[in-house]
């Protein structure tokens, strides 16, 4: 087991990528704190981990509240005696054009998607520095590498996450702490699954734009997080891994050479 005797905290792990990651880390031997705003979701995931033979505790927390992030790290250390892995994954998506989004929604989006990542990292570092070892993995996005119509706040937040990752990595590398990010593309999380049913044409166009011709599965992102959390990534620091089926490898310009994805 790659993570035997290690302790992991995963935010936003009551569903989607966070759920897949919590289960994947637990399957490799980590004791996992399943953190989510949805208590029912957190309880379900923790129960499923335990039924599979793993070690997990559920924790209800609003990551937009700094005190609850402090309590989150304290919960992990009080329960398990240490903290080895932090996966910042929680997000709240607010849509709207840059010139039309309300200040209230902008601030809420930044609080959940960026400020919470910084503050959770800050809290975790207070433990990890003393241990002289730790791995922090942030969920970025391909939307942090380019713009999307109607997702200006999300684009800004995820770009911020990528550079927060880099800053953390260089500042704490000599303390034995690594910090990296995973940047997913279109993944079959609950919101995407819902939109596939309500907007089937958009789903078709999205799949057509992905060179691999399909959406990604949450487990495919969880596998990247597992790698970054493990000793197999011992010299990987301050970078991000894109997992998007080749989406960002393409210029977006239609084929001019008479060949396409099905040639």
Predicted regions mapped to residue ranges:
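Conserved glycine-rich cofactor-binding loop
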Residues: 7, 14-16
């Amino acid at each position: 087991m790659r993570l035997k005797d290690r302790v992991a905290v995963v935010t936003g792990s009551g569903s989607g990528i966070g759920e897949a990651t919590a289960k994947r880390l637990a399957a490799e031997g980590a004791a996992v704190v399943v953190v989510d705003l949805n208590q029912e979701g957190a309880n379900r995931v923790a129960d499923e981990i335990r039924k599979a033979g793993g070690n997990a505790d559920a924790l209800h927390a609003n990551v937009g509240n700094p005190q609850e992030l402090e309590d989150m790290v304290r919960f992990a250390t009080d329960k398990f005696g240490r903290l080895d892995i932090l996966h910042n994954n929680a997000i709240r998506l607010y849509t709207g054009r840059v010139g039309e989004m309300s200040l209230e929604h902008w601030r809420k989006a930044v609080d959940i998607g960026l400020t919470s990542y910084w503050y959770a990292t800050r809290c975790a570092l207070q433990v990890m520095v003393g241990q002289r070892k730790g791995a922090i993995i942030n969920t970025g996005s391909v939307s942090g590498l380019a713009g999307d119509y109607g997702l200006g706040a999300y684009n800004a937040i995820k770009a911020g996450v990528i550079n927060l990752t880099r800053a953390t990595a260089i500042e704490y590398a000599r303390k034995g702490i690594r910090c990296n990010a995973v940047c997913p593309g279109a993944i079959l999380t609950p919101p995407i699954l819902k939109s596939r049913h309500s907007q089937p044409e958009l789903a078709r166009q999205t799949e057509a734009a992905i060179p691999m011709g399909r959406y990604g599965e949450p487990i495919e992102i969880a596998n990247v997080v597992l790698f970054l959390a493990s000793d197999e990534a011992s010299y990987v620091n301050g970078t991000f891994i894109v997992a998007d089926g080749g989406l960002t490898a393409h210029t977006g310009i239609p084929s001019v050479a008479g060949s396409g994805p099905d040639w």
